Amino acid sequence: MKNLIFCCFVLLSVIPASAQSLVKVDYSVDKCATIKQLDAVLRSPEGEPNKQGLLILHHGGGFSLNTTQQYGEFFAKQGFVTLELKMFNEHKDTPDPTTLHAFAMGGLKYLSKLPGVDPKRVSAMGMSLGAFLTVDSASTWFYDQYQGGDLRFHKLAALYPVCWLMTEAAKGQPQGIRPFTGLPSSFLQKWEGIPLLILAAGKDSYDSQDSTACGNFVQNINDTKQAQVTKVEVFENTTHGWDHGKNYSFLVRGGCTGRTNCTNITVYSPTAVDKGKQSVLSFLKAQ
C-alpha cells in the first residue's frame, strides 16, 4: 500500500499544472494619466510555441460570462501565448470607451514584452464590444492616443461586431453611439493597414439581420490599403453572440440599425464556435 501511495504521489507530481496564471496589466488613458492595472489571464503555449501572442477581448456582457476561456485554451494549444483581459466583470460595470481602448493598448504592450513572444507578431481578437476595440486597433488614432510608439498589432480578428455602428464611425458620424462616446469623430478616418478579419453574424439583430452590413462597412473605409486587407466572412443563419453558450434575448435601446431599438436574439451555435476558431487560426497562421 505504501508503494502504491508513493507511486501515485510521484505520478501526480510530474503532471504539469494548468499553464495559466492571473497577471496584472498596466494601462494609461493618456500620457499624463496615472498608470493603473487590470487583471488578466495569461496562458502559456501547450503545443509547439510559435512566438505569437494573442490578446482576447470579451464582449459587453462582461468577463464573468466566461466566453474568452474557450479561445484562450484553444489558441494556447496551437502554440500561442494568450492574454484574456478582465476589462469588467458585469455589463453594469462597463468603463467608458476611452478606458476600454487603453486596456487594449495595455494588452499589446504587455504581450510584446514577454520572453518567447515576437513583439511584431502580437495579434488581437474580440467579440462584440471586444470586436469594436479590435477594429479600432487598426486606426492611427489608437496608436497616437495611447502612445503605441512603433508597436502595432500584427493581425486583428473581430467576431460579430455590430457593423452599422462601424460604418457610422467610418463615415465620421459616431455621435450618439454609446461604444464611441468621448472619442473624436475622426477616430476611424486614418488607418494603419493592419490585416483585419471580420466574422459576421448573418442574422445579427443589431444589424437588422442584414448579412451585407459588414461588407458595407468595408466599402466605407476611406483608406484603400486598409480596405484591401480587411476581409469579411459571413456566418449565415447565425446570431450575434453565437459563442455565449446559451440562448437568450433582451431589449436594446438605441443600439440597432440607425440608432433604433430592437430585441437582440442570441442563439448558441457550437458549429459556429468551431468554425470561428478555425477561421481565426488560419488567418493568424497565414503569411
For every predicted segment, state its role.
Residues 208-221:
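Short alpha-helix in the alpha/beta-hydrolase fold that links the catalytic acid
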Residues 87-109, 113, 118:
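Catalytic nucleophile-loop/oxyanion-hole region of alpha/beta-hydrolase
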Residues 39-50, 115, 184-189:
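Short beta-strand-to-loop junctions in surface cap/lid or active-site-entrance loops
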Residues 66, 106-193:
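Primarily recognizes the serine-hydrolase "nucleophile elbow" in alpha/beta-hydrolase
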Residues 227-287:
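C-terminal catalytic histidine-bearing segment of alpha/beta-hydrolase fold enzymes
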Residues 48-52, 57-94, 165-166, 205-210:
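Short substrate-entry loop that stabilizes the transition state in hydrolases
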